[in-house]
């Protein structure tokens, strides 16, 4: 048969190997491609013959993905999504630095100031040395988000950009979040998990953010697109319920409306100017704001 991946004619794999180490999926593994009921099949074909993939291609993608998922340096968990990332040259230093920048993951042997300096250099197109590896901002970089769905896996997103391109988008996200913080707040920047926690009732038994929210927010950050409305709705719901505006919630409001303003490229009367500022404006006459 004709392989949909390689475009070559050859033997087709009937059942693809399982993908393991995805949070929330079966411990024995889950399938990325599977057809296990007649309702999913067409033209009399059975199982994965409905999506013909050559034996070599099926072996290659499952082996490579299982290898990456087994290496904790390439894998990050955010909400219900398992995120795996890698550089084209396969050097793990790219994934390690990306994890520190995007998820606030610990970066051994480097301080937060060191990390910010390296990210700034890469964003400006200058290579940096990280753990004896020279990181090229023009290196192709890939980010894959997977979520469990019973015995199957769902691809939440598969993103490709240069390493420097991803970092520039992440830095733009942090710039939008910038806001005056109280003296007791030790977070220089707000990691993604902390933003998502602002949408959750901290007194509830389940403190997980809404399904799909983590993946949608991460995709918006990495692609430099508008934040999902569900993030804004989740934060405003907690503000109304708890009558408290934390630094994180104020930062989400500011970032959401600033990105909205950037996207529509014109003045929007629905966006109060005060919301876009870094600090509180006590002299405003905007009643909802005050």
Segments predicted by a language model, with ranges:
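The −1 position to Zn-ligating cysteines in a subset of zinc-ribbon hairpins
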Residues: 2
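Short Cys/His-rich metal-coordination motifs, predominantly Zn2+-binding knuckles/fingers
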Residues: 6
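Extended alpha-helical scaffolding segments
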Residues: 10-290
């Amino acid at each position: 048969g004709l392989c949909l991946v390689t475009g070559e004619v050859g033997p087709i794999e009937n059942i693809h190997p399982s993908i393991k180490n995805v949070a929330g999926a079966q411990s024995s593994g889950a399938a990325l491609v599977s057809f296990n009921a007649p309702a999913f099949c067409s033209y009399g074909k059975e199982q994965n013959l409905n999506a013909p993939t050559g034996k070599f291609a099926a072996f290659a993608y499952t082996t490579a993905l299982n290898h990456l998922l087994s290496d904790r340096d390439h894998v990050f968990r955010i909400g219900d999504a398992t995120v795996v990332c890698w550089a084209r040259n396969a050097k793990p230093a790219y994934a390690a630095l990306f994890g520190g920048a995007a998820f606030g993951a610990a970066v051994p042997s480097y301080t937060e100031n060191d990390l910010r300096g390296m990210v700034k250099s890469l964003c400006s197109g200058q290579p940096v040395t990280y753990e004896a590896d020279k990181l090229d901002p023009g290196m192709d970089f890939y980010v894959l988000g997977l979520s469990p769905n019973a015995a199957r896996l769902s691809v939440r997103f598969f993103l490709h950009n240069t390493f420097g391109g991803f970092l520039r988008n992440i830095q733009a996200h942090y710039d939008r979040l910038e806001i005056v913080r109280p003296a007791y707040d030790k977070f220089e920047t707000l990691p993604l998990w902390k933003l998502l926690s602002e949408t959750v009732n901290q007194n509830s038994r389940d403190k997980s953010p809404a399904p799909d929210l983590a993946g949608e927010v991460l995709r918006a950050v990495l692609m430099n697109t508008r934040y999902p409305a569900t993030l804004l709705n989740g934060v405003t719901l907690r503000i109304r319920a708890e009558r408290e505006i934390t630094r994180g919630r104020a930062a989400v409001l500011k970032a959401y409306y600033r990105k909205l303003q950037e996207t529509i490229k014109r003045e929007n009367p629905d966006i109060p100017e005060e919301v876009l500022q870094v600090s509180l404006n006590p002299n405003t006459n905007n009643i909802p704001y005050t």
